[in-house]
Amino acid sequence: MKDNSRRKFLQNAGLATLASVSPLAAQPEKNKELFIHHVYFYLKDPNNAQDEAKLLEGLNKLAKVPTIQYVHIGKPAETNRSVIVRDYTFSWMCFFKNIIEEEIYQTHPIHLDFIKEYSHLWEKVVVYDSVGPKKVG
């Protein structure tokens, strides 16, 4: 094979290979890193038991979004150290297989309905999102 035709063959083979790679395979970090979405809800009236029960009802509905792998709904623990924040009403932590699954959650009708139906209850929401390997060590 002549150098010129060999070079063209290799260029075309390289282009064919690139064209066959899916966009998801080209972004392995997005698919392999566990995504954690941690939200702290602060009620407008933190002493209102009805509002607290209503928000808990909404969080339990929200847990039904199918891309969520695991959910934890928590209240502040009875721990007292200077670095601990305990002024929130509920902690909502959910785990996703990857960022793509979390992006689906963000636009899912259950999530959008949750915001529409329950956002009047809170005065503030703080969100911490993180990614990392599924298992370390």
Predicted segments, located by residue:
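Short, glycine- and small/hydrophobic-rich beta-strand elements in well-ordered beta-sheets
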Residues: L24-E29, N60-T89, H120, V127-G132
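Surface-exposed, polar helix/loop patches in the mature regions of secreted/periplasmic/lumenal proteins
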Residues: C94-P133
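C-terminal segment of N-terminal export signals and the immediately downstream linker at the start
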Residues: L24-Q50
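Short, solvent-exposed mixed-charge patches
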Residues: V136-G137
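N-terminal secretory signal peptides and thylakoid transit peptides that target proteins
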Residues: M1-T17
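Short amphipathic alpha-helical segments
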Residues: N47-I73, T107-L121
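Hydrophobic h-region of N-terminal signal peptides that target proteins for export
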Residues: L18-L24
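Short, well-ordered beta-strand segments in beta-rich or mixed alpha/beta enzyme
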Residues: E33-L43, G74, T79-Q106
